[in-house]
């Protein structure tokens, strides 16, 4: 395996984690693929040794179609998560391999970041982590589940060098 000097941590982790990244969005100001990789891996690394995730950036029209078809909501949302084992309750074990798809709509993310006074990078990081946590079985429908998921999001964002994602700030 060829090693990269610029991002050596990616070479080591690629043996365990594969991110199939596709940018099918026309939006400007999207972080680099390596950033999405780093954010996704930060959420996975303590609970999964192996993972295969597709992360696709789609424009609003396509994101809206997925949200309508799979959630019955006729609008573009920031992130959608599709776990291979969705609907099954599986304990997170280090030996499992996680499979799933994430769809992120950059136009929605950029709009929300501006409205919430967050940098785009911070909001993309948060929603990538948020989506991966959904793939891992976290949810926020019930209040007690939301507390657990939000606490994990805050922990991971702080570890990645970002502030609490649930606090607004000016940039």
Swiss-Prot record:
Q: What is its EC number?
A: 3.1.-.-
Cofactor(s) this protein cannot do without: Zn(2+)
Would you tell me the Gene Ontology cellular component terms? cytoplasm
GO MF annotations, alphabetized: metalloendopeptidase activity; RNA endonuclease activity; zinc ion binding
Signal sequence, start to end: none
| BP term (GO), one | rRNA processing
Note the PROSITE patterns from the entry.
UPF0054
Which Gene3D superfamilies did the record assign?
Metalloproteases ('zincins'), catalytic domain
Localization recorded for this chain is: Cytoplasm
**Residues bound to Zn(2+):** 130, 134, 140
UniProtKB keywords:
Cytoplasm, Endonuclease, Hydrolase, Metal-binding, Nuclease, Ribosome biogenesis, rRNA processing, Zinc
* A Pfam family per the record: YbeY
Q: Describe how the cofactor binds.
A: Binds 1 zinc ion.
Q: Say which family it is in.
A: Belongs to the endoribonuclease YbeY family.
The family database entries (HAMAP family) matched by this protein are listed as: Endoribonucl_YbeY
Q: What does this protein do?
A: Single strand-specific metallo-endoribonuclease involved in late-stage 70S ribosome quality control and in maturation of the 3' terminus of the 16S rRNA.
Q: What is this protein called?
A: Endoribonuclease YbeY
